[in-house]
Every structure is written in C-alpha cells, then in structure tokens.
C-alpha cells in the first residue's frame, strides 16, 4: 500500500491551521516541513533503505494513541534508510502522542534497523509517551549519538541504543527507564543533565561518565554501571546507586536518599558529602572510601562483603549518624584508625559503632580517638590484634613487597597485571609483570599506597623514608 498523505486546512476567525496525516512507506527522499506540522501519524511509518526522511526544526510528529494496551498494535517509526531530525534550541522537534497522559505509553517508538543499514541523526528533540523510545536492533560499534538540550518524558524506555551516547543539558523525566541496558556494546556520557521521577535513570551500561548531573525523586538511579561520576547530586531518591561495581564517585552530594550507595566492590568513593540518607554507604570488598563527610544519616557506613579488610576506609568524618556511624555486618575484624568520629569520648564512639561487642555474630572494629579538630589522634582503641603489618614488607601467599631507597621490589609467583594507587584512588602505575622479582623505580610522595593485581587483590604498604 502506497504512503498516503492527507492535508487538512482548517479556517477559523481568519487564521489557518494545518495538519498533515501520514502513514505507510517512505520510498523517496521526503521532507516534513514546519508548514505541514503537526504530522498526525495514523499508521506505522517505514523509511526504506537508501531513502531519507528529513524533519525540519519546530515540527511536531504526533502518533495516534492506542488504547488496547497491546504493544503489537502500537504505531511506530521504523528507519531502514536515514532519519535526519535536527532541531534547534528555539525550535525542537517533538515526537509525541495524541494522548500525553502521565504514565501512559501508547505508541511504540523510533526503531533504527541497523541490520538493514538504517541510521539516524537526532538532536534537540522531545520524545514522550513511547513504549520502546529510541532503539536499535543491532549494536553499532563506533557509532556516536549526540543529544543536546533534549527532553525524554513519560516513556517506558527512553533510549535503548547499543552505541556511544553523549547527552548535554538533557532532561529525563517520569520514564520507566531513562538510559536502558547496553548488553553488548556502548557507553553513556552525560554532562549537566537532570534525571527526575524516573523509575530507573540508568541501567547496565558498559561504561558511564556523568559530570554535573542532578538526580532527584527517582526510585532507582544507577544500576550495575562501571565508570566515573563526578560533581553530581543525588537528592530524595530511593536508591542512588545499586548493584554498583567498578565506579569512581568523586565530589558528589547525597541528601535524603533511602540508600546513597549500595556498592558491590572494586569502587572508589572520595571527597563526597552524605547527609540525611537512611543509609549513606553500603561498602563491598576491594573498595576505597576516602575523604568523605558522612554525617546526620540514619546509618553512615555498612561494611559488608566477604573480606572487609580489603576495603580501605580512610580519612572520613563519620559523625552524628542516628543509628550507627559504622556498622559491621560481617563476621570479620578490621580497623578504621584514620577516620574521625567527631568525639574524644570512647563511650560515645562505641555507641556509634555496631560490631562484635553488640552482636557476637559480627566482627570487631578497631578505631582511633581524635581531638575535636579531627586532625590529631589522642589514642587508639584496639579490640583485637589483627597482625597486619603497618609498613614493609607485606607478605601473603603470592606477594612480597619491599622498598630499597626509592625503589619498590615486587615478588610474585605468577605473571599478573598490577596497578598502583594512592589512598584517594589516583592511579600511578598500570603494568604487566612477570613471575619472580620486579624492580619499580618510582617518584612517589611519602605515604600509604595500594598495589592491586588482576584478580582484585589489594595490598597496602607504606612508601617513604626507611
């Protein structure tokens, strides 16, 4: 059936209103103009291979809502050729429904058929009330989609694209899922974006970089995504992070969340502020929690995992949290001697630490008592001897590390990949070494460092004057 376009001209009080009904196949290069807008989609549209549909800035494409609640009946725009929809800041291109009721998704979305050579250029658009949002049927390694000043609202999924995605000044509002899973390929990069009242903001991307973004009133924000999150705010969400691993969270602000960070391991959380959360941080194995201010939450830090001594909790202020400043939910012993609890009274500090003294199924926690400035240690509270060397050498079944002058010697049983970090998570070395002894000439400031191997094992040592 050939594509049928009907043009309606309605006159009222001397003013003419245009709308164009469209459906079916696009078999030749076609432009939808602002003069013909809005375009009322009465049947699904397919742009065929080798053909281009260009939509001018300021156009509205309005899909007729389906009320059967059967997605098989939903109308869609399928791209087997090329779609060019590049709006402007003043004249965005709008893909919407004839019924924009909140929470009602009633058209299918924009489907990019990469398997047939389909491509899209989309920018400065509004997308709302779609079920699948914008999706592609095959991964697009190397493909880049740039979205600037876009708005994604009331979609079941806003975007399901296995490609490299860049968002700038975009808003994700009241979606089921904002940026959906990238199971095979893809990355997400967002700068100065807002995520509000979504059920889930970002899920299972292969790599994310978020800078200067705000997350408010979402049920879930970031699920299972490694990457870097810097200078972002998470306010009044249920879960800010969950099933998180391999992330660097730097200079962020967490306020009023049920859980700030629910972290599974191998992450760095630094220079951030946590306040008014029910639980600020759930910390897994092989992670760094450094230089954070964690105050006035229900619980400050819950330490979990199977090897809590592999997590480095250093130089934080853990103060005035209602239930506990620190809760050990494992049966392992560890120490937090470089953290300040904002009190010089050991009884007050003990009341804020939940460990084996409170529940014999839990391990014990050693700590230090600081003065009111949190700058000077007054004394140590050692509940259990951990037999952890404070400096070099440090020995386990596969490692031996020692320092000679300004050289670090590493002895390993098997070939491995190593990384060298400082306590803030900054990487100074990433190197493959052979079995046996390796000599590393390093220019490092005096201090505490961590050496990790490819299996996630981390080993703390002191580097400096002998």
Where are these regions (language model features)?
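Terminal non-domain segments
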Residues: 2-7, 153-154, 160-163, 168, ...
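Beta-strand/loop edge motif enriched in small/polar residues
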Residues: 19-285, 290-385
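C-terminal outer-membrane/trafficking sorting elements
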Residues: 393-466
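Bacterial Sec-dependent N-terminal signal peptides
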Residues: 1-21, 384, 388
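Short, Lys/Arg-enriched, disordered terminal segments
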Residues: 1-4, 358, 464-466
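Acidic/polar, low-complexity intrinsically disordered N-terminal segments immediately downstream
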Residues: 39-41, 387, 395-400
């Amino acid at each position: 059936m050939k594509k049928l376009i009907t043009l309606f001209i309605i006159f009222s009080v001397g003013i003419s209103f245009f709308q164009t009904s469209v459906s079916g196949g696009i078999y030749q290069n076609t432009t939808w103009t602002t003069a013909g807008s809005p375009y009322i989609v009465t049947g699904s549209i397919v742009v065929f291979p080798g053909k281009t549909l260009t939509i001018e800035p300021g156009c509205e494409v309005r899909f007729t809502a389906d009320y059967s609640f059967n997605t098989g009946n939903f109308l869609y725009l399928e791209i087997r050729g090329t779609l060019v929809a590049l709006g402007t800041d003043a004249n965005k291109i709008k893909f919407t429904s004839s019924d924009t009721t909140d929470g009602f998704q009633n058209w299918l979305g924009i489907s990019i058929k990469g398997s047939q050579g389909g491509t899209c250029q989309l920018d400065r658009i509004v997308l709302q009330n779609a079920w699948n949002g914008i999706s592609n049927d095959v991964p697009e390694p190397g493909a880049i989609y740039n979205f600037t000043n876009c708005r994604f609202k009331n979609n079941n999924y806003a975007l399901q694209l296995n490609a490299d995605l860049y968002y700038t000044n975009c808003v994700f509002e009241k979606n089921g899922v904002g940026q959906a899973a990238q199971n095979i390929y893809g990355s997400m990069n967002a700068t100065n974006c807002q995520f509000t009242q979504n059920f889930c903001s970002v899920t299972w991307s292969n790599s994310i970089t978020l800078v200067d973004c705000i997350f408010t009133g979402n049920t879930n924000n970031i699920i299972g995504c490694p990457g870097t999150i810097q200078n972002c705010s998470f306010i009044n969400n249920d879960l800010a992070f969950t099933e998180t691993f391999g992330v660097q969270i730097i200079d962020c602000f967490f306020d009023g969340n049920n859980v700030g960070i629910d972290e599974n391991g191998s992450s760095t959380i630094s220079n951030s502020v946590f306040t008014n959360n029910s639980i600020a941080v759930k910390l897994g194995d092989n992670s760094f929690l450094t230089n954070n201010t964690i105050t006035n939450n229900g619980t400050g830090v819950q330490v979990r995992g199977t090897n809590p001594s592999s997590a480095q909790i250093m130089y934080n202020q853990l103060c005035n949290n209602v239930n506990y400043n620190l809760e050990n939910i494992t049966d392992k012993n560890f120490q937090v001697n470089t953290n300040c609890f904002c009190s010089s009274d050991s009884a007050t500090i003990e009341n804020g630490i939940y460990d084996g003294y409170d529940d014999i199924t839990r391990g014990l926690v050693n700590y230090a008592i600081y003065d009111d400035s949190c700058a000077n240690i007054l004394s140590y509270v050692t509940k259990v001897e951990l037999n952890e060397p404070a400096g070099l050498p440090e020995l386990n079944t596969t490692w031996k590390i020692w320092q000679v002058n300004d050289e670090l010697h590493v002895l390993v049983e098997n070939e491995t990949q190593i990384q060298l970090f400082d306590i803030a998570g900054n990487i100074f070395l990433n190197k493959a070494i052979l079995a046996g002894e390796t000599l590393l000439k390093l220019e490092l400031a005096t201090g505490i460092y961590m050496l990790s191997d490819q299996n996630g094992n981390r080993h703390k040592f002191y580097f400096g004057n002998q």
